[in-house]
């Protein structure tokens, strides 16, 4: 009984944190004027260069040894892990995988490392109440995850990582993207604040 009550209390606390985070982000989003960085828009529309494609993928996709050859993008998609509308200022086709501030009920807040042993223990309890804040359970409640799968299954793709830590909280989803047979390249970007600090 104690363990069950512990999880109930923990989930209530997570619900409270989610509510406060939503209030804070709505306030920030309404009060800030996002400065558009044109270099980000340029990167999003770049073709895929042969030199960026993994050696594994080159065996199946490229029949040329020309590393400077470019492959134009047939389709682009932003998979946004943020709740705000910032990415929609750069691009029209955006999947808010964790939901959006535009509809706070869709927001997915929690943890998503199904590869962790503790997840397996919770799952084996056969009580979905324990899984309320597990992201992959919530992904099934919207079409966003299915839309993402449809995109990555359709054709070879390149991933640009901007502003994401690639931490454990999204480990399972990132594993799906990074290890997919259509993923030909992963390019992480970071923001250089000054000579000593980056983000």
Each PLM stretch: what is its role?
Residues 1-142:
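Extended, H/D-rich, highly charged conserved domains that either
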Residues 148-199:
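SIR2/sirtuin-family catalytic core signature
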Residues 131, 135, 145, 156-160:
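A near-ubiquitous, low-amplitude feature marking generic local secondary-structure context
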Residues 140-150:
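A short, well-structured beta->alpha microelement
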């Amino acid at each position: 009984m104690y363990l069950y009550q512990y999880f109930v209390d923990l989930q209530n606390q997570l619900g409270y944190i989610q509510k406060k985070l939503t209030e804070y982000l709505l306030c920030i989003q309404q009060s800030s004027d996002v400065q558009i960085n044109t270099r980000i828009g340029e990167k999003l529309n770049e073709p895929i260069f042969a030199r960026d494609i993994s050696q594994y993928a080159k065996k199946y996709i490229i029949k040329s040894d020309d590393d400077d050859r470019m492959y134009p993008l047939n389709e682009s998609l932003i998979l946004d892990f943020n709740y705000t509308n910032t990415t929609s200022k750069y691009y029209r086709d955006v999947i808010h995988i964790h939901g959006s501030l535009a509809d706070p009920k869709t927001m997915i807040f929690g943890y998503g490392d199904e590869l962790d042993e503790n997840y397996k223990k919770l799952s084996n309890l056969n009580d979905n109440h324990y899984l309320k804040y597990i992201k992959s359970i919530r992904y099934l409640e919207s079409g966003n995850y299915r839309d993402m799968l449809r995109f990555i299954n359709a054709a070879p793709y390149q991933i640009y990582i901007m502003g994401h830590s690639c931490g454990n909280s999204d480990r399972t989803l990132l594993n799906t993207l990074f290890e997919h047979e259509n993923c030909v390249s992963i390019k992480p970007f970071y923001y250089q604040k000054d000579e000593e600090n980056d983000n």
